[in-house]
Amino acid sequence: MSKKDNSLAPVMPSRMMIRLSPLAGVVMFTFLLTGLAACLWAILVSGKVDLLPEKLDWDAIRNGEITHHIAKELAHVPFAKSAADLERAASWLAIGDTGPRVRQGCANWLFLTDELKIHPHAAADADARAQKVAALQEQLSKRGIRLLVVLVPDKSRIASQQLCAVERSPLLASRAQDWQRVLQAKGVEVLDLAPTLQPLGSDAFLRTDTHWSEVGAERSAAAVAERIAALGVSPTPAKQFVASVTAPQPRPGDLVRLAGLDWLPESLQPAMEQVAVTQIKEVQGAVEEAALGEDDLFGDSQLPNLAVIGTSFSRNSNFIPFLERAVGARVGNFAKDGGEFSGAAKDYFSSPAFKQTPPEVLIWEIPERDLQSPYRDDIMLDGQPG
């Protein structure tokens, strides 16, 4: 007869555990009841929670977008947000965890998780985007508008020496180049900024932010200006710009906010970086006066013939001012924070600015991380798909 292994026997609770268990149960019950009450109040009384997404179809139901939308809406309920903030703070202070949306690399370098995701239908979604861009390029060409696609490489690609324990899959190595080749085969003008930014290394990006630094933005703007010149386009209206640099000052990073740590005292957050800001101003004078002709009754000559659509990259670190200085002309900025691949394009093509004063060159800035994410075709010209 084999001897019984006492190590497999259940551990009996201690007297302390027995005494505290009713209190723990009451605390847990109170917490759950409070959370339920807060959610019911938000749904039934406050009117601040929309249970259904704007567009409801079978794809949204099959892909779980409805439950995802509800969870996202309920996350903004005051009690839920406070509880989430406390959880994020405890995880960060105890074990250095930055949450599901942010990864921590070397020495307080933060990276966006979206850059590292392997999407289930990556190839199909990337191809759908390429087909869309090619179709739009053809439509724009018929209107006399030239399209220049500008690919912004991932921070985790360019600042790879700062990844440390953060892993970037080999499957992502050729993501941008593969997409660029597909577009070029379709006759689309593409500028990949990776060769421009790679020599800068980690200096090209901000440490606690998803976006490029001013060094990276300025170098990228120069590359875009060089490509525009190669297209034989003369940017208008011609302007002159002067620049000055401020003393370094603290710059909050958006990755700290995405990690849910921006509400903590600064001393408990990931170390904030000090950034010198370039101030670029237009010089008023002879260039502007010479540009005004006698037949320019409505000031059309002062409207930019270059326009930019894209994401928050075009709205950060002075990219547009650097571009204006590099081309020597004003540039229309129609980029959209959080717009991802389609947001800015969709808004711009339906706007009076595009319909009434279309540009000669449209610069479409696209982050690499958006190339393979789930895609829904929602960009139209004149009410028709591109």
Regions found by a protein language model. Give the residues of each.
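Extracellular glycan-modifying ectodomains
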Residues: 1-386
